[in-house]
Curated annotation (Swiss-Prot):
Residues 244-475 are annotated as: Spike body and stalk (antigen domain). HAMAP family: Rota_A_VP4, Rota_VP4. This is Outer capsid protein VP4. A motif (YGL motif) lies at residues 444-446. The lineage of its organism: Viruses, Riboviria, Orthornavirae, Duplornaviricota, Resentoviricetes. The record marks R229, Y230, R243, A244 as: Cleavage.
């Protein structure tokens, strides 16, 4: 049988030679190297760690206390508190709105009650005010409708020379009361957002999000650092207004060998979604997969008078798997899996261009980026059925919003590029998508069937900024640029080979596959069909055996071997010898020794099924076909179909085939006229062999049978057998041969083009994916 190759690999996977061990040790050797980069970033200390820099999030951190600012006339932005810190008792703020005039004055402690004269908005006014408190200052809010007569509205009594106001929602908010019992009130001023405020004392700006901290200042005073003689108030008007340029290269710091450069770039991103559509074999009514795949795109655009050559790679993560199944007949329309971008997904766009910013992108910090939103609308895809009107998947929409940026590496056919990875978060929108002529309608997201929607590419504009440590000599390029590790190259080749492997599933002829599954494949015949390995079969086989040690199957064999040894020891030492059945029960799981009344049969059977594969290796029946035979035959067929494959990739591919081929398996044990069938997915059946009538599944009986009865791969499972019998009718002999997975009978049904048997074998082949 073809599964002989797996037996040989497992039997020899524990051998190793001394040279391999030496190579492994040398590959793991590391060295500590100390580098003194010099006084960068305006500090006298060497850098501790260079990483990808800041990662943007949707959280904005604002400065708590901004200032102090000198007296000035400004239009304060809404939702920012102005914290005033006057030195003398006088008018400290005034505002001239259309419907009302506003002013705030401060009185020092021990100020007698009486008429006070102030200049408010250019006019001399007189008002009766006073502050009899011995230690605290008093702030008065004054208001007037004509600008001549003012009246007191609110008062604030405080030991600190601090008061605050804020514009928000068309209102002017102020504080009143006696510290610490203070609260806010508000006045309504017309067009307050555009009203200029004359602030006649030093002041600070505090964001609304820090209101709690502001009230702490009002109650307890400013922190000591704000009262330092080294803090000098400045006019807001002296701030430089700087207009950013599309290309900026700014020297942050520099020494003889290295310098820090800040690169700011306005960029245009264009990208394409890639997709893969795999149609199942058979009559042409079934699709096995519609999925996204990475897609490269190269383009040029103009920036600041120069032509920029750019390269992008678009990939997705966190996609949602959907499926549609209209029935079990071979002519029923089925889409086993199609991927959809939704709100929990991510879109990654790796960007590189030929500018100076990417020349030495090795040590980077302070990385940030922002982009315009991208609207992506899906197109249509026709499911071309052999007969009848075609269903059509159409519609779908997401809007991609900029979410984060990190460093990355892009792979082209010739070189790997240090690049920036921009992460976008989709937000679903209209229109919805649907599959016409089905019940699949009013679904939201962007399906993988036609994500481009007729567009050649999607485009957005944005800007990124980063600070990079580069050589002071601009002609020198860091050696790591445009390089990649051997492991990265290997992973890329393995990824490409996986995709090619999975696409070959629909090209396998079933009758030839059965013949191949019956052949006693060994390691030499498995690998000798590859042109590039004809002269290196021995080395390839050795590498595969070494890699096989890490497979899940090899670990299961080792674990169960130890458990069997422990079980045998416990039997020999026990005072009363137990049956072999009880030993196997303990091996499988002590919880399987329960009564039929246990409501967790599915969990128990799935645990047993996961270990029956190992038992099948040791007790495979003569003449019966197993899942491992089909897996090995598919593996051999696909290897032969691939024109070129690197020998160093084969160990990973073959080891993955052992663990991942046909993930859903059913195993069968026959006891006289009753067949017991369990699946590693938790499904279980017990039925009569002659009539396929279901009976009660006896867990204890099944556990006893596991010990002495051979384990049979249920190539044709119970549901398929019942469907075959109901639609075509089969004899008792045919039924018994199918239960034993007799390859001759399977091939007869396939040659007769029996749609039910062919569909079952096709599904097994399609499960041979890595």
């Amino acid at each position: 049988m073809a599964s002989l190759v797996y037996r040989q690999l497992l039997a020899n996977s524990y051998t190793s030679d001394l040279q391999d061990t030496i190579d492994d040790i040398s590959a793991q050797k590391t060295e500590n190297v100390t580098v003194n980069p010099g006084p960068f970033a305006q500090t006298g200390y060497a850098l501790v760690e260079w990483t990808h820099g800041d990662i943007t999030t949707d959280e904005t951190v604002q400065q708590t206390l901004d200032g102090p600012y000198a007296p000035s006339s400004v239009i304060i932005q809404p939702q920012y508190w102005v914290l005033m810190n006057p030195e003398t008792a006088d008018v400290i703020a005034e505002a001239d709105a259309t419907n009302k005039k506003y002013a705030c004055v401060m009185l020092a402690p021990n100020t007698e009650e009486g008429d006070k004269q102030y200049t408010i908005l250019g006019r001399q006014i007189t008002i009766n005010l006073g502050n009899t408190d011995q230690n605290r200052y008093k702030f008065f809010d004054l208001a007037s409708e004509n600008g001549e007569t003012y009246s007191k509205i609110q008062e604030l009594l405080t030991p600190n020379r601090l008061n605050a106001f804020m514009k928000d929602q068309g209102r002017l908010y102020v504080y009143h009361g006696t510290v610490p019992n203070i609260s806010t009130g508000y006045y309504t001023l017309d067009d307050i957002a555009n009203v200029q405020t004359n602030i006649k004392c030093n002041y600070y700006i505090v964001p609304k999000s820090q209101t709690q901290q502001l009230e702490d200042f009002l109650k307890n005073g400013l922190p000591p650092i704000q009262e330092s003689r080294y803090i000098m108030p400045v006019e807001r008007s002296v701030q430089n207004i700087y207009r950013a340029k599309p290309n900026e290269d700014i020297v942050i710091s520099k020494t003889s060998l290295w310098k820090e450069m800040q690169y700011n770039r306005d960029i245009v991103i264009r990208f394409k979604f890639g997709n893969t559509i795999i149609k199942s074999g058979g009559l042409g009514y079934k699709w096995s997969e519609i999925s996204y795949k990475p897609m490269n795109y190269e383009y040029t655009y103009e920036r600041d008078g120069e032509t920029v050559v750019a390269h992008t790679t678009c990939s997705v993560a966190g996609v949602n798997d959907f499926g549609y199944n209209s029935g079990s007949l071979p002519t029923d329309f089925v889409v086993s899996k199609y991927e959809v971008l939704k709100g929990n997904s991510y879109v990654y766009i790796d960007y590189w261009d030929d500018s100076q910013a990417f020349k030495n992108m090795v040590y980077v910090r302070s990385l940030s980026a922002e982009f315009n939103a991208i609207n992506c609308t899906g197109g249509t895809y026709d499911f071309q059925l052999p007969v009848g009107q075609w269903p059509q998947m159409r519609g779908g929409n997401v809007t991609l919003n900029s979410d984060a940026v990190t460093l990355s590496t892009q792979y082209t056919d010739f070189v790997s590029l240090n690049s920036l990875r921009f992460r976008f978060k989709p937000a679903i929108g209209e229109p919805f998508f649907e599959i016409t002529r089905t019940r699949e309608t009013r679904l939201y997201g962007l399906p993988a069937s036609n994500p481009m929607g007729g567009n050649e590419y999607y485009e957005t504009a944005g800007r990124f900024s980063l600070i990079s440590l580069v050589p002071s000599n601009d002609d020198y390029q860091t050696p790591i640029q445009n390089s990649t590790t051997v492991r990265q190259d290997l992973e890329q080749q393995i990824s490409d080979l996986r995709e090619e492997f999975n696409q070959l599933s629909s090209e396998i002829a079933m009758s030839q596959l059965i013949d191949l599954a019956l052949l006693p494949l060994d390691m030499f015949s498995m690998f000798s069909g590859i042109k590039s390995t004809i002269d290196a079969v021995k080395s390839v086989t050795t590498s595969v055996m070494k890699k096989m040690k890490t497979s899940t199957l090899a670990k299961s064999v080792s674990t169960i071997t130890e458990e069997l040894s422990d079980a045998a020891t416990s039997v020999s030492r026990a005072s009363s010898i137990r049956s072999n059945a009880s030993v196997w029960n303990n091996l499988v799981d002590t919880r399987t020794q329960t009564s039929v009344a246990t409501n967790d049969i599915a969990t128990q059977t799935s645990r047993i099924a996961s270990k029956l594969r190992v038992k099948e290796f040791a007790t495979q029946t003569e003449g019966g076909l197993s899942f491992n035979d089909i897996s090995a035959a598919v593996l051999k067929t696909k290897i032969d179909k691939i024109e070129t494959v690197q020998p160093k990739i084969l160990p990973t591919i073959i080891t993955e085939s052992v663990d991942k081929f046909i993930p859903t398996r059913q195993y069968r044990i026959i006891d006289k006229d009753i067949a017991y069938e369990i699946s590693n997915s938790g499904k279980y059946f017990a039925y009569r062999v002659d009539t396929f009538e279901e009976v009660i599944f006896d867990v204890e009986k099944f556990a006893d049978l596991v010990t002495d009865s051979p384990v049979i791969s249920a190539i044709i499972d119970f549901k398929t057998l019942k469907n075959l019998n109901d639609n075509f009718g089969i004899t008792k002999e045919q039924a018994y041969n199918l239960l034993r997975s007799d390859p001759r009978v399977l091939k007869d049904f396939i040659n007769q083009n029996n749609p039910i048997i062919r569909n079952r074998i096709e599904q097994l082949i399609l499960q041979c994916r890595i």
